[in-house]
Amino acid sequence: MKHHILTLCLFSVQAIAQPKIHFDFLSHNEESSQWNGTPYYNTNRLKLISLANYFQTNGMTWNMQSDWRYLISVLTKETAALMQSTNNKSILRWMHEDKGVEMDPHAHESQYIYPDVAKLLDSIGLPESKVMGGSIYNDSNGVNVWTNLVNGQYGLVFPNYFWQPDCMMGGGTPNHVNDLKYFGFWNPQDTANYLIHDSTSHLRHIGVGCEIKIKDTISFSFIMSQVNDVVNAVQSGQYPSNGFYVQTIFFEQGDLNDTAFYNKVIAVADSVNAFVMAGVAQWSTLKQSYTEWETIYNAQVFQWECGQMSIKINETASQLITVYPVPSSGKIIFDLKSSGVQELEVYNQEGKLVLQKQVSGPGNEADLRSFPGGIYLYRLSNHEEITAEGKFILE
């Protein structure tokens, strides 16, 4: 059975407790030749040891997703002398077996396709992962396409090795210009109909939420503002209470070699951990989240886009605002009865944000003449709380 997933969840935010967010760190190492250099590899190895120890001590989770070039370096550079610092194990076996880091294949598939990378992980002595660590969702991924893996596939470099994943995460596009930013779990139909759930397909998508990336060009304060936005959206009821929210925090493994970058990762980890300690979030690897979704949530298909809001809101504090004319042919006036600047947000029937502006006092005009007719929702908020909510009709 194929069907579109219902995303217009109706609920009262006051009546239902909101779920916890499942945070997880996610790292990639790319196909770049820097991993061929032994000094670079060894410097990174020390950073991995330090970070894995820190995450384990503080109960934080990490999915490390590796491509072929780095894995070959692990196979060729892990000497007996080097492994003395990691319980006489390779760095990846130690991270997984001793520190609880999940290991998944990640493939650009320019030479090694996903089964080949899975074979390299197996050669290192790691257990088989059933997670595809990212792929182009709406087109080919290098020389391959994700639909080839639905029923399993043999490798190109290792033609006798067969691998069938259960899940794929993310939903990328070339150069990451228009990646999917969704929460939830569903079985995509194909590259052209990725958001349509197909219960006959084996391969399941794990949505990893909004795009939150740690980079040297992105400030700590901006990263944490993104984290705060996700937490607030779930806890305030903007996102459905029956949803399952996995939010990954991404970084490039090679960037750990820079001390300032490494320290930024630690700072973000500590700040996110404050939400965990407050009881509104938890740390979960992708496998842990998937298992919880299957068992506790009964594998209920769910799909929610980052920034989308629930279609039902509470019409409150009408004495604080007058909205007219209703219905309207395109121009809406918002008269505020209270002083001070507030944030006005307007959403369409699908819960998508279509207008955002600052307003103050009476006579605030919103020109919606280019928008299609239908029911629209508005929300007023200050820095501390939502002050008014309601709806209006465009003809």
Regions found by a protein language model. Give the residues of each.
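Sec-dependent N-terminal signal peptides
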Residues: H3-V13
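Alpha-helical scaffolding within the catalytic cores
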Residues: R45-L51, V74-W94, P115, Q189-A192, ...
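Metal-dependent polysaccharide deacetylase catalytic core of the NodB/CE4 family, i.e.
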Residues: M60-N144, V246-Q253, A278-A281, T285-E294
